[in-house]
Structures are given as C-alpha cells and as structure tokens.
Amino acid sequence: MNNLIKSKLELLPTSPGCYIHKDKNGTIIYVGKAKNLRNRVRSYFRGSHDTKTEALVSEIVDFEFIVTESNIEALLLEINLIKENKPKYNIMLKDDKSYPFIKITNERYPRLIITRQVKKDGGLYFGPYPDVGAANEIKRLLDRIFPFRKCTNPPSKVCFYYHIGQCMAHTICKKDEAYFKSMAQEVSDFLKGQDDKIIDDLKSKMAVAAQSMEFERAAEYRDLIQAIGTLRTKQRVMAKDLQNRDVFGYYVDKGWMCVQVFFVRQGKLIERDVNLFPYFNDPDEDFLTYVGQFYQEKSHLVPNEVLIPQDIDEEAVKALVDSKILKPQRGEKKQLVNLAIKNARVSLEQKFNLLEKSVEKTQGAIENLGRLLQIPTPVRIESFDNSNIMGTSPVSAMVVFVNGKPSKKDYRKYKIKTVVGPDDYASMREVIRRRYGRVQREALTPPDLIVIDGGQGQVNIAKQVIQEELGLDIPIAGLQKNDKHQTHELLFGDPLEVVDLSRNSQEFFLLQRIQDEVHRFAITFHRQLRSKNSFSSQLDGIDGLGPKRKQNLMKHFKSLTKIKEASVDEIVEVGVPRVVAEAVQRKLNPQGEALPQVAEERVDYQTEGNHNEP
C-alpha cells in the first residue's frame, strides 16, 4: 500500500457510494459499491484475502470514490460505471450473446424472418428463442401454414414458393391490409400456444382433401398437424397462466457465484442463461449488480414478471427493472425459483468437480512430482499456511491431498498459542511441532511430502523441527508466490533450490490447487475466529444472552451489521426475550458509535474439516 492510498483511506466518508480502483497506468480495473465507503474500501487493504482478491489488490495504485444519497443510487451508479469503463475485475456478461427472434416485418407485403436485433420499426417480434436452430424449426412450420412473402424484392412474376402454397404471389394477389393483419394475429396466437383453432382448420382441410381423393394434399395437412404436436412437446409448459417471466436463482461457493436465469415465454421454458464468476463483495450485492447489467443488454427484453430469491432486496431490483418483481412464497412460481437455484448449485458443483476429475491426470501428476523431486510417489501430501492481521488471532491450517485429491476429513485448524505479535516463522515452528509431535507420539502415518505455503525462511523452520528436533525423515518443499500472489515456483532440496517445473504441467496445476486450498482454508478459519470474537465481545455483559442465544442470532442474521439494523420484533422472532432484545439494540446502537469493519463479514459455522489439533 503506497502513501497516496494511506492518505486517502483517512479521508473516506461513512456514506454510501461507489469506489473506483485504478492501476499504475490510471486504468480503472474495478468498480464497487458500498453502504459504508470507509469500511468497504479499507477492507481491501487490511488482512488476508483469497487469491482472486489479492490479485486485484496487488494492482491497485490509486482509488477514487463518489458519494451517493442512498444504497440504490450507489447500485445504479455502479452499473453505469461498469458499463462505461468495462473494468477487467468486474462481472462481465457473455460477449455478443444475443438470442434470435421471429419477426413479421412492417411492410406492405409482410415477410416472416429471423433476426437477432429488436428495433422500434413497427414490426412484430416473437421470442427470444434459445438458438437459431429452434427459431428456424418454428419458422419452417409457420412458412408451411401461413403464406407470407418470401422474397426481399418481389419479382415481376410468381416464384417457386407460390407453386408450393407458401406465398400469395403478392404481385398478382390483391389482398388488402386487413388480410395480412389477420394473418399476423393468427401467427401471434400460434406462438402464444393458442394453436387449437389452427389444428381444427388443418383437420377440416385434411378431411376435405381426403374426400376429394387428394391424398397427397391430405398427407401434407396430416404432417403439419403432427409437426405442431411435436413442437408442443418440445416446449415444456412451466406455468399455467402463459405469462412471460424471467426467473433468477443463484448459488455461491468457494468465492464463486453462479447465476441462472430461466426464460419463460407464454408459460413455456424456452432457454436458460448461465454465468459463473468470482465475487468480491457480499453475494446479494454482486447479484444485484449482475441483474442491473443483465437488463442493460439489448438482447434481454424486460418480461411481464421477474421472479427473484427470498434473500434479495425487492426494492433494489425494482429500481433496476421496469417490471413486476416477485419473491414467491409458494406454488409453481416458488418452484421455478427453487429450480433455478438448484441448477445454479449444480453448475457450480460441476465447475469444481471438473477440477478434481481425471484420475489418470492426477495420478500422473503425483508420479511426475515424485520423479522430479527424486522421492517416492507422494500419495499423501500435507500443506500448511498461516493467517493473521498484525499478530491478532493468529491461526494456521493444514490441508491434506491423498492421490491428488482433497481429503477434507483430515483437514486441521490450529490456534497459535505460544506466539505474541506477527511472527510468521515462530507460528510455523509451533504448528509443525504440534502436528508432527502428535504424529510421532501416536504413531500416525506420516505424509509422503510436506508443502509449506511460503519461501525459504518458512521451509527452513519446518526442516529444523522435522529433522533436528523430531528426527523424522519427511521431504519438505515450499511454494512461493509472485508479486501478484500467484503460485510462482517450487523450492526443494538441501540447500533449497528452485525446481524446474513447467507451468503447463499437471504437477504444477496440482501444486497450485493445493496452495489455493490451504490459503482458502486458513483465511476462512481466521475470519470465523475474528468475527466470532468480535461478535462475542460486543454482546458480552447482556443479561439473559448466553452462548446459545448468541449463536442463534449469528446463524439467523449472519453479521453484527444485520443484527444492528434489525428491529426488536425481528430479534424476538429468533427466540430472544423482548427485554433481552431491547438490551441488544441498546448495546449495538449507542449514540454516535460506529460499527467495526469486521461486522461486515459473514460467518459460517458449518465449514468442512472443522477439527482442531491440540
């Protein structure tokens, strides 16, 4: 952090607004919004972060901010700034993603065409459709039923389509404007699923043709009826009211968000839009940013209704979308939202599963790593990382990979007990001594390789404890990061040397996953500990509020900020007596006192590998 940033951090207001991060070239690399600019912007330059946020922070050389009157105003400003500047670290929707529409042109002799551009030109647009193949299938069927003009410039004499009954030969046919309006209305009814009248007409024509011994013509009508039936089957009915609506669902895990949007048109689910991206703020805030960007895309027409999950601010979405916004509580609409959320979860799980798939590649990676380090194949790898903020709440974490895959049941967390102040070497000495002292005492199976998230100093400390103090023979390697906090090089040997390791190799990708995982696990534990300590300390001394009620409050509200903003009645609903709820509000809302930054962080008491070493 440079002196300019340090000075600016002191001047930040507590108002809502937008902040703009810039790199060394003055280029805007990230735009964000905040309810409290001081707390949010300072958080980037304090404490540990996950890999993606560290990469962002490493490029920040300057920042600006814009104060707004409200959170919603900040949200709208953020969306406009992102659209204007296209910062590389912000959420970006898929490029050039536009869906096809079927259009009846506004011409004297209308045509039925497929287009990806919706214009205010008097034409009638139907869609969007999931892809051009689906749109073409429907158009081919419409061409066989409705004789619209096919030629861009009508020829002076009748064309091929006239002879096969798919064109009225407008140069010789004297149909008036009312005729074409009527035909356009029939197309509209058909595309809305109101096709019973058309099927009845085709059945009548088929019967007349059969009676007249025109069997080929009767067979054509039969085929058309069957084609309509097939199309009906393909377009699954999701709602009985035949409304046009967009259904949003999202899911977050490991610093990533997946948003799924179901396009329901005329009660039929015609397509879904899937986007996965890393998020940097609270998930619900980044979700709102996504929605705002989504409807700025010209290809995304605003439907009659937009359905959103329960935890999203309805008023904020109303400010973004000129449509009816619903948070359904029950029924088929609630089922649609649940389905979108479920699909978002599945998509995100698939993303992470793909990283852990391919047994052959993973097995090959650990075998190659063993050959590279000249050690037996490291079937079991244990990796360590420390986390603290200026020496407060220092912790360490260990993750275990067996056969190249995370073994989460073997993960361990450590509260550093003997170190005072920010001493990373001493913390590493303590945790290595505790872990492998226990391995030695209890005759546990040692790992085939220890990987330290750190450089030469941390690795040498681990070697001293393992080899000199405990007399164990376990290979130890170090993973150093570059100035962008990315996995950079592998250290190994005696003395330590940089291992010649290709960045495109499977063994490099394996080490990268191990380093990212131990870093994530350590930071998650540290944040939980800080948040829990802050939470407990701010609510200490309130009569009637014991550990169980504190835990219930945190599980329900997720953060001190939300407890502070809650009404007494909302706190009572969690099972807290009214007199205690009133005491909580008095404690958290003293006149003029600001809430500490740590209260913004969310806490999850159900993290994996929740085991502590002695």
Curated annotation (Swiss-Prot):
Main location: cytoplasm
CDD domains the record matches: GIY-YIG_UvrC_Cho
One of the GO BP terms on file: SOS response
GO MF assignments: DNA binding; excinuclease ABC activity
Basic and acidic residues: bias regions: 599-614
GIY-YIG domain: residues covered: 14-91
This protein's GO CC annotations: cytoplasm; excinuclease repair complex
Region annotated Disordered, chain positions: 595-614
Subcellular location: Cytoplasm
Pfam families: GIY-YIG, UVR, UvrC_RNaseH, UvrC_RNaseH_dom
Domain UVR: 196-231
UniProt keyword terms in alphabetical order: Cytoplasm, DNA damage, DNA excision, DNA repair, Excision nuclease, SOS response
SUPFAM superfamilies hit by this protein: C-terminal UvrC-binding domain of UvrB, GIY-YIG endonuclease, RuvA domain 2-like
Function comment: The UvrABC repair system catalyzes the recognition and processing of DNA lesions. UvrC both incises the 5' and 3' sides of the lesion. The N-terminal half is responsible for the 3' incision and the C-terminal half is responsible for the 5' incision.
Subunit structure: Interacts with UvrB in an incision complex.
Family classification: Belongs to the UvrC family.
PANTHER family in the cross-refs: UVRABC SYSTEM PROTEIN C, UVRC/OXIDOREDUCTASE
Annotated HAMAP family: UvrC (MF_00203)
Protein name according to UniProt: UvrABC system protein C
High-level lineage: Bacteria, Bacillati, Bacillota, Bacilli, Lactobacillales
Gene name as annotated: uvrC
